[in-house]
């Protein structure tokens, strides 16, 4: 990832408009800021949320609250709780998120 020249700025995530994204089941709320090709998000999953697609995009994910299970298409899983992270490169391991109890994440991709 290359971060382009940009002035420093603070982001008050509580003031960033949330967009809703349906899961299978559940709901995700995304608060998104974009800097050229870099997307930075705070994402909240409802309890029982399962992503409705397999994702091949690379991410850096930090769990701020709750718990998620990152399911890989090969059947393996990573279980992460608050304070834990995972990272995956573009087109490496197709994955999707599941949150049995709900979660809040910080994601950069």
Protein language model features and the residues they cover:
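Short, conserved beta-strand element in jelly-roll/cupin
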Residues: 45, 54-70
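A short, N-terminal "cap"/entry segment at the start of jelly-roll beta-barrel domains
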Residues: 1-42
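Conserved short histidine dyad/triad with adjacent acidic residue
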Residues: 36-55, 89-92
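Structural motif
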Residues: 60, 67, 94, 102-104
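A short hydrophobic beta-strand segment most commonly corresponding to one strand
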Residues: 85-89, 100-109
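Short beta-strand His + acidic residue motifs that chelate non-heme Fe in jelly-roll/DSBH
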Residues: 52-53, 70-71, 88-89, 93-100
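Short acidic-glycine-tyrosine-enriched beta hairpin
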Residues: 74-91
């Amino acid at each position: 990832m290359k971060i382009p020249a940009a002035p420093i700025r603070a982001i008050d995530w509580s003031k960033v408009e949330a967009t809703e994204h349906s899961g299978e089941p559940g709901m995700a709320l995304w608060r998104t800021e974009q800097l050229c090709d870099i997307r930075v998000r705070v994402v909240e999953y409802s309890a029982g949320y399962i992503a409705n697609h397999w994702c091949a995009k690379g991410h850096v994910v930090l769990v701020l609250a709750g718990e998620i299970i990152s399911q890989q298409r090969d059947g393996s899983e990573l279980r992460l709780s608050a304070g834990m992270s995972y990272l995956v490169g573009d087109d490496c391991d197709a994955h999707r998120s599941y949150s049995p109890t709900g979660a809040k994440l910080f994601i950069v991709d």
